[in-house]
Amino acid sequence: MSGLFVSFEGVDGVGKTTQVERLRAYLEAQGRTVVVTREPGGTALGKAIRQLLLHGVDGGAVDIAPRAEALLFAADRAQHVAETIRPALERGEVVITDRYLDSSLAYQAGGRELTPEEIRSLSMWATNNLLPDRTYLLDMDPALSHNRLEHAEDRMESAGSDFQSRTRQAFLDLAAAEPNRFRVIDASQSIEAVWAAIESDIKELA
């Protein structure tokens, strides 16, 4: 049985974690072996990088520069693919990741004003050109999704409404450019309605 690679994308607070777990349970009930992971932080190296990306450097008076941030995301992703994602796919397993390279494109190119070409080139090099078979973009107005957050804001979440709005639009632009890979789902619906859309689609892949 061939491996299957699925990613979930969207601004913070849209319900990705909930739907990742629903999909895991569904696929395991179908007899598939499922690996659930996330970016940043899907490996030991990634966890250390995640702390830097989300909370900054202890004692650092200056925020992480956009190019440095892009390289940190790429380092996390390169290790993630080499250590976790590609080996699981080669074993014929399903990999579900909460964020992948599209988050870099949306948050860094859309939100941080680096060019999409720069970020995509770096990400594709880091992953050795590995793209998901399916990407579910859970879409919602950031003003609504922000109210759903149940934890203290991290560095990305506190970047402001303009940043979040640019990021949302960047995600939608990515989905429009790759309609065969993306499925855009209205995340303002109920959890059950969002899951129903995912379940209907995944049956064609799994």
Swiss-Prot record:
The role this protein plays is:
Phosphorylation of dTMP to form dTDP in both de novo and salvage pathways of dTTP synthesis.
* Residues the entry annotates as binding ATP: G10, V11, D12, G13, V14, G15, K16, T17
For this UniProt record, the keywords arranged alphabetically read as follows:
ATP-binding, Kinase, Nucleotide biosynthesis, Nucleotide-binding, Transferase
Taxonomy, top ranks, is: Bacteria, Bacillati, Actinomycetota, Actinomycetes, Bifidobacteriales
CDD domains named in the record: TMPK (cd01672)
Q: What's in the GO CC field?
A: cytosol
GO MF entries: ATP binding; dTMP kinase activity
Query: Per its UniProt record, what SUPFAM superfamilies does this chain match?
Result: P-loop containing nucleoside triphosphate hydrolases
Q: Which Pfam families match?
A: Thymidylate_kin
Q: Which GO terms describe its biological process?
A: dTDP biosynthetic process; dTTP biosynthetic process; dUDP biosynthetic process
Q: Which reaction does it catalyse?
A: dTMP + ATP = dTDP + ADP
Enzyme class comes to transferase
In terms of InterPro entries, this protein maps to: P-loop_NTPase, Thymidylate_kin-like_dom, Thymidylate_kin_CS, Thymidylate_kinase
- Source species, please? Bifidobacterium longum (strain DJO10A)
Q: Which family does it belong to?
A: Belongs to the thymidylate kinase family.
Q: What is this protein called?
A: Thymidylate kinase
Q: In the Enzyme Commission scheme, what number(s) does this protein have? A: 2.7.4.9
